[in-house]
Amino acid sequence: MMTMKGRTVSAALASKKKGEQSNRISPELPTFDTMSILSGSHPEPVAPSGPANLAAPLPRPLDPYRWRPEFPILQRKLDNGKPLVYLDNAASTQHPQRVIDAMSDCYQRYYANVHRGSHTLSGESTLALESARETCARFIGAASTHEVIFAAGTTAAINTVARAWGDWRITANDTILLTIAEHHANIVPWQQLAQRTGCKLEFLPIDDAGEIADDVVEEHLRRTRPKLMALTAVSNVLGTEYPVERWTRLAHQAGATVLIDAAQAAPHQPLDVKAWDADFVVFSGHKLCGPTGIGILYGKRELLEEMPPFLGGGAMIRTVTTEGFTTSELPTKFEAGTPPIVEAIGLAEAMRFVDDVGLDAIHRHEQQLAAAALRGLTPIEGLKIFGPPADRRGGIVSFVVEGGHTLDLAHWLDRRGIAIRDGHHCAMPLHQRLGVSGSCRASFYLYNTLDEVEALCAAVAEFHQRFIAKSRKRNPPSV
Ligand code: PMP
C-alpha cells in the first residue's frame, strides 16, 4: 500500500481538496489545480523549492545493516543454500518493500490511465503521476516540472535527444565530442545521427588510470569546436567520477550544448542539475531502487520548448486535423502515448527512500567499499584492476585475472552466492582501450557491507590460487 505516514493517494487527494498542506515525505501533491490535470492541460506549476535533495544528509555514516531488512530479496538464500551477495548494482539495483508497495497500491486501488479522464480513478492516478514528477524535479534540483520528462530509461532519453535535438541542430559540418569511457547508450545514438547527417564524432582519450585531464578537454574543445559534448558523469566500468560541472562550463565557453549521462551518478551522489548547468541530464530508475521502464530526461526549459518533439501520437498534441497537428506544452510534448504511470509512482518512492538514507552518506559508504575492495584485490597476483584510486571513483571496481576467463571467474563467484557482472558492460571501445575484451565488475550500493567485500576478495583469491597459480606451477611459462 502506498501509505507513507499512513496516507494513501486517495486520502492525499481528499486532504488536498480540503486545502491541507502536504508533508514532505507523503506522496507529494501537485501544486497546480487538480481539475486542469484531469482535463489534460498543464498550467504553469510552481517551481519545486528548496535544495536538490529532499532532506539533509544523515550526519552519521551509513549502516547498511539498518537498511538491508527493507529489501526482501536480500534475505534470499540461493538454491545451494548460500546467502545472496549482490554486487551487480551498476547493472540494476534491488527494491525496498516500500517501492514494491507503492506500485502495488496503485494497481490494487486507484490504477487507471491518466490525463483527460473524467472519473475518480483517472483523477487519482493523474494526481499521483504528477506528484511523482514533482518528487523527481526536487530530487534533481530542476527549476520546474516542465523540465522533467518521463522516458523509458537512459537509453531512450539519449535517443530522444539525438532525434529531437540532434536531427534539428546537427549538420554535416558539426562535431560531437564524447569520451572513450561512454556506455554504448551514449555512443550508438550519435553514430546513428552521424549516419543520418554526416556529422563527425570525436572521443576524449583516458589516461592509464581512466581519467581525463582538464587540458585534454580544453584542447579537444578548442580543436574540434563541438556542437555537442555528451559524457558520462561516472564510468560504468572504471567507476571514475568525471568533473561534469567544470567540464560543462568549459564546453559552454566553447559554444557546445552539453548532455550528461548520469545513469551511474544520480543513484549514488547528490545531483543538482542547476549546479551542473548541463543542457540535458539523463538517468534510469532501475539503478536507483526503482522499477525498470522509466528514467528521467531533464532538459533546460528554453531548449525543450524550442525543440521539435520526437515520438508522435496521443498526449503530445494540442490539436490534430487531417492537415496536421500542433504540439502540447511541456512536459507532455515529449511523452507521446500512455506514460509509465505506475513506474513513475515507484520511482518517486525510490527517490524518497534513497533520500531518507542520504545521498552523501551513500556516496561515502560506496567509496569505503570500493577502497576495501581495492585493498583486498590488489595483493592478488596477476589481477589487473582498472580505474583510479578510491578517492576519485564511485562504488565500481572492474578487474581481470591474467590467465583466467572472466566468465569462469563470474561462475566461480556465483557458486558462492556472489553476483558480479562479466563481459564488456556495453563499453566495447573502452575495453579496447584497456586492451582486454571484457572484465569482471563488482558494483556496490547502500545495502552492501564490508563483509560482502571481504567475501568477494577471498573468493577471487581462491579462484586465482586454485586455477591460475596451481596450473602455473604445473606448466611454468617458458623463458
Ligand atoms: N549509461 C550508463 C553509464 C550506464 O551504466 C547504463 C546502464 N548500464 C546506461 C547508460 C543504459 O541504461 P539503461 O539500460 O537503463 O537505458
Give the residues covered by each predicted segment:
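Pyridoxal 5′-phosphate
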Residues: 2-6, 12-16, 24-479
